Amino acid sequence: MKKLASIAVGWLMAFLLLGISPLWAQEEAGNYFTITGIVKNKDNKRKLENVNVSVPGTNIGTVTNADGVFSLKIKDTETILGLEISHIGYLNSQVSLKDKEDVSDLTIWMLPAPNLLSEIVIFGNNARGLVEEAIKKIPVNYSVDKNLLTAFYRETVQKRRRYISVSEAVIDVSKTAYSDREPSNDRVQLQKGRRLLSPKTSDTLAVKVVGGPNLSIYLDIVKNGDALLSMENLNYYDFHIEEPVNLDNRMQYVVSFRPRVSLMYALFYGKLYIDFEKLAFTRAEFSLDMQNRVKAVEAILHKKPLGLRFRPQEVSYLVTYKEQNGKTYLNYIRNEIRFKCDWKKRLFSSSYTVFSEMVVTDRKSDFAAIPSKKAFKEKQVFYDLVDEYWNEDFWKTYNIIEPTESLEHAVNKLKKQSR
């Protein structure tokens, strides 16, 4: 458990800016077409965030951004008939694409799922027993083979509401079978990345995430047996069954949990979503318990300058999984850290938000192992390994999470300031 409360939080380093030596690679572009669109709630027209957008019959997919916008790049050689759209609390939506024309600026409407509380049998009101059964079924419900995930990763740092750092990458994530719940056997390799940093002298305090892309390993709470979902860790929490919800046109148990004991390190509180029929974990929303600020700081902060005071405000996570061909796979991870910093001799503090997210865009089972010397290390800083290079066609055929309008605006400002 302590492993999750340190490495998986995404350790932060706060320090004065120094020069760095980046590394990055480039791939060849191929022939492809691009599908773009926006997903909205049909009832109230609200834009929907973190909606799964996938291509049935393939492993290709992405999620919508905070503006409800998505894009998918697909090879011309792929035969696709449409898209499948899924989101928690909504009925799945299908979009027909009989040809590859007119696939830009789609508007996709989703209907909220009806409340089916009366149609689902509560698990004997034994919330912990339900979680235990789902843990026992992990080797059956999740991949029994090794897999190589292609994923897009982004981390941003905001000082108040202003972006001061943006970095992105396409990564490979190799995972062993889920019957092996030991994360040290999984590896991450950077394929391609880029970064931007504010050149303002007022932003000389830099904030970086240690081990950022490795959240695909340590925050995969189903695969990582040292995280929340072990029989031993269950003893630290109280569990309660909440009202069920719909996800992927399937009913989900919702189990909330809170700390029931005090340990030497910070625990978590949140909700687990468990498929009604398969008893597979499909989603987890949880946050670091902030009741003891000293423990919270120990979980988050790796290094800071002398005289800097660090006050955590919130650390939250979202981890989602998606079923395909009878097995459930990692789909999306998000980590948000909010904190305040001030110097002992200054009157006012500055608020910061560090946001990291990763979406799996493709998956294959036939691949060469990632060599140890090329694997992203547990305590490496992702930002230091990529170059400051920000042309419009940088990602070529790679699928990404579309930047929000506010992020695009911030990137344009940072580019102008860096010239």
Predicted regions and their residues:
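Bacterial Sec-dependent N-terminal signal peptides
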Residues: M1-T36, V53, L117, S418-R419
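Short, acidic Ser/Thr/Gly-rich low-complexity loop/linker segments typical of extracellular
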Residues: N59-V69
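Extended beta-strand-rich segments in extracellular/periplasmic secretory proteins, especially
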Residues: G225-F276, A280-L288, K322-E323, T328
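Structural motif
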Residues: G30-L48
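A short, solvent-exposed loop/turn motif at the edges and junctions
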Residues: E84-V95
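Short Pro-Gly-centered beta-turn/loop motif in secreted/extracellular proteins
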Residues: K45, L72-I80
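Surface-exposed, low-complexity/disordered segments
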Residues: W109-Y237, D248-M251, V297-L301, P305-R419
